[in-house]
Amino acid sequence: MLKQRTIKSIVKTVGIGLHSGRKVELTLRPAAPDTGIVFSRVDLPTPVDIPASALSIGDTRLASVLQKDGARVSTVEHLMSACAGLGIDNLYVDVTAEEIPIMDGSAASFVFLIQSAGIEEQNAAKKFIKVTKPVEIRDGDKFARLDPYFGFKLKFTIDFRHPAVDKTGQELEVDFANTSYVREIARARTFGFAHEVEMMRELGLARGGSMDNAIVLDEYRILNNDGLRYDDEFVKHKMLDAIGDLYVVGHPLLASYTAYKSGHGLNNALLRELLAHEDAYEIVTFDDPKAAPTGFGFDAQTAFA
């Protein structure tokens, strides 16, 4: 059977929170089958466990924020994206602040951390959410949509009307049957505009933001001396975010995702719309790994590619 996965050993790292600017300690621990991805605020007097779930996402203005009993864990999308890309089903994430550290602004540090811990299969069938009917959410000209598809592919279009962004790819389509997440998506960094960063800092946000963890643009150009990691890094990062946003549903999706100018809020609304229609999806497993869609096999996802 196609099996669930966790990590082999405990790994730790330290980084800063993008918005708080404070030091955050992050510990990843193995978890038993059917645990899911569980975030734990270990800095609180009584630690609070917050399982990743579409219905636990609260604030989505600047990041995806998990909330439970007054406790929050913000900016979960890059770590969730890495878990999705490597096929991690079960994991405990201990964090000492209300923010996952931003690291270099991409998912690459989390991929490295998980690969350093080692990935192991568990004696339980991996569960997928198979989309059986189209589901769509619109907000003005923005939209996000899921269609039935035997695999996982995404098509994302951005439109920032900025000269530096316009010169790069505005549209990207990826099918993980023939694309390596680690090689093609994981290193794409978050990006922001200098004037917005100043405004956010005045509001007490983005205190940890810098060119070490984001692509920063002025009105005309990219300010980072080292330029871009991918020719189409902007749209690739939006896809990285979407992969993480969608993975909070609890299982990998078997679906085709199409989006235009979507963000954390629209992605979460799409998941809620899916879950509200029980006839639009089903939970499936694969007794024979060869019967599963290409790209979800252990070797395909966990290779050091």
Swiss-Prot record:
SUPFAM superfamilies recorded: Ribosomal protein S5 domain 2-like
Residues reported to bind Zn(2+): H78, H237, D241
Co-factor requirement: Zn(2+)
GO biological process, one term: lipid A biosynthetic process
A molecular-function term among this protein's GO annotations: UDP-3-O-acyl-N-acetylglucosamine deacetylase activity
Catalysed reactions, as listed in the record: a UDP-3-O-[(3R)-3-hydroxyacyl]-N-acetyl-alpha-D-glucosamine + H2O = a UDP-3-O-[(3R)-3-hydroxyacyl]-alpha-D-glucosamine + acetate
GO annotation, cellular component aspect: membrane
Active site residues according to the UniProt entry: H264
Pfam families xref list: LpxC
Top EC group: hydrolase
Keywords: Hydrolase, Lipid A biosynthesis, Lipid biosynthesis, Lipid metabolism, Metal-binding, Zinc
Organism superkingdom: Bacteria
Signal sequence, start to end: none
PANTHER family for this protein: UDP-3-O-ACYL-N-ACETYLGLUCOSAMINE DEACETYLASE 1, MITOCHONDRIAL-RELATED
HAMAP family the UniProt entry points to: LpxC (MF_00388)
Function description: Catalyzes the hydrolysis of UDP-3-O-myristoyl-N-acetylglucosamine to form UDP-3-O-myristoylglucosamine and acetate, the committed step in lipid A biosynthesis.
Protein's name in the database: UDP-3-O-acyl-N-acetylglucosamine deacetylase
Species this chain originates from: Burkholderia thailandensis (strain ATCC 700388 / DSM 13276 / CCUG 48851 / CIP 106301 / E264)
Highest classification ranks of the organism: Bacteria, Pseudomonadati, Pseudomonadota, Betaproteobacteria, Burkholderiales
Gene that specifies this protein: lpxC
